[in-house]
């Protein structure tokens, strides 16, 4: 099977020859720790890992992904506003003003380079005037929205072997980026009409973006980024999510399904058990990363939702950090879901630096056996 066929078959309860091997990805601090623990300096971690556990190199295939940018254009200026004793007050590319450790800079807020905690001081949409100033940044015809040869590249990949998909924020995530979490929560109560207006704007922008993509080719997966849960609970009630968010999710899913995209993947950290029924109703068929520390339990989800929902992730990062018998027990815990299909197992978020390189190698070897690679 090709990589693409295997991915789709695995998530849609088909008959893959093997399950995709996706142990999880490290960030900068993790790689720095690993280089002190046995990962050679200069070695690409995945290539070295595969060699160390006895997997062949990843196939050398041409990987084309026609670029389409769902983000604001232009970005806000990234700048340092104030230097404090051990922190920086900065403006990020989205227009947020926040405080971060002086060990980092604005690049860490632009890309997921590392695990960065920040304090939010001001968000770009706090008034109606701010909102009117924000909207022009989502011009569909802005330079750079689609790469110049988007159509030509899209038409080249009809018989591709690799997975091609697009990711963009869901309505909750996007409005939180504009208004801030507390600001958005207050707007749900104080000015619901404004919330609906912003959701409608974002829904329409995404639909027009997808329409242009689907004219050229059909991706394999569309991924919604929608972090909207804490430990044990969602950030807003399921009733409020149904009222404000479900219409947008449903409209997107209808458009995506009509285009023939096989996988619609919802990404939310935290405990998502009370949200999954809404996602199924909207038309999504996969979700991730299934964070165990938040209370997510793949076995319980599978019993409750059956084959209506597939998953990626779901392996407790804390057990991987502890290693040994606890790590092996964690892999045994998820094995029934692996065997039942509709699941690509992996670490339940970015791989943190407390997972040592030796533990990660052992975990990856066990995972490769479980998924049919060894």
Task: Give a label for each model feature.
Residues 78-82, 105:
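A structural signal for short, hydrophobic beta-strand segments that form beta-sheets
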Residues 98-115:
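Extended Gly/Ser/Thr-rich low-complexity repeat segments
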Residues 30-78:
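Segments that shape or occlude catalytic/ligand-binding pockets
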Residues 1-39, 89-91, 100, 117, ...:
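Active-site loop segments of alpha/beta catalytic cores
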């Amino acid at each position: 099977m090709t990589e693409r066929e295997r991915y789709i078959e695995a998530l849609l309860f088909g008959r893959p020859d093997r399950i995709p091997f996706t142990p999880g990805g490290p960030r900068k601090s993790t790689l720095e720790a690993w280089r002190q623990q046995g990962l050679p300096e200069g070695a690409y971690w995945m290539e070295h890992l595969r060699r160390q556990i006895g997997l062949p190199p990843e196939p050398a295939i041409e990987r084309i992904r026609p670029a389409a940018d769902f983000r604001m254009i232009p970005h806000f200026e990234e700048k340092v506003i104030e230097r404090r004793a051990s922190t920086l007050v900065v403006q990020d590319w989205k227009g947020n003003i926040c405080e971060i450790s002086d060990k980092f800079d604005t690049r860490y807020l632009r890309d997921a380079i590392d695990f960065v905690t920040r304090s939010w001081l001001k968000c770009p949409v706090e008034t109606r005037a701010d909102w009117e100033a924000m909207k022009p940044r989502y011009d569909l015809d802005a330079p750079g929205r689609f790469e110049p040869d988007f159509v030509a590249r899209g038409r080249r990949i009809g018989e591709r072997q690799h997975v091609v998909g697009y990711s963009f924020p869901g309505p909750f995530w996007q409005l939180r980026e504009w208004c801030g979490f507390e600001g958005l929560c207050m707007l749900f109560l104080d000015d619901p009409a404004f919330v609906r207006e912003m959701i409608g704007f974002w829904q329409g922008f995404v639909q027009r973006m997808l329409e242009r993509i689907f004219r050229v080719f059909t991706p394999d997966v569309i991924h919604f980024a929608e972090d909207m849960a804490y430990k044990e609970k969602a950030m807003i009630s399921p009733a409020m999510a149904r009222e404000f968010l479900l219409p947008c999710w449903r409209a997107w899913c209808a458009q995506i399904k009509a285009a023939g995209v096989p996988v619609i993947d919802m990404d939310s950290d935290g405990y998502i058990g009370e949200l999954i029924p809404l996602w199924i109703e909207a038309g999504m068929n996969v979700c991730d990363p299934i964070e165990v520390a938040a209370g997510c339990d793949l076995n319980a989800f599978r019993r409750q939702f059956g084959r209506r929902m597939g998953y990626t992730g779901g392996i407790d990062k804390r057990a991987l950090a502890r290693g040994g018998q606890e790590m092996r027990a964690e892999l045994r815990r998820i094995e029934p879901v692996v065997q039942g299909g509709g699941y690509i197992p992996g670490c339940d978020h970015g791989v943190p630096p407390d997972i040592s390189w030796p533990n990660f190698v052992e975990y990856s070897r066990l995972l490769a056996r479980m998924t049919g690679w060894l």
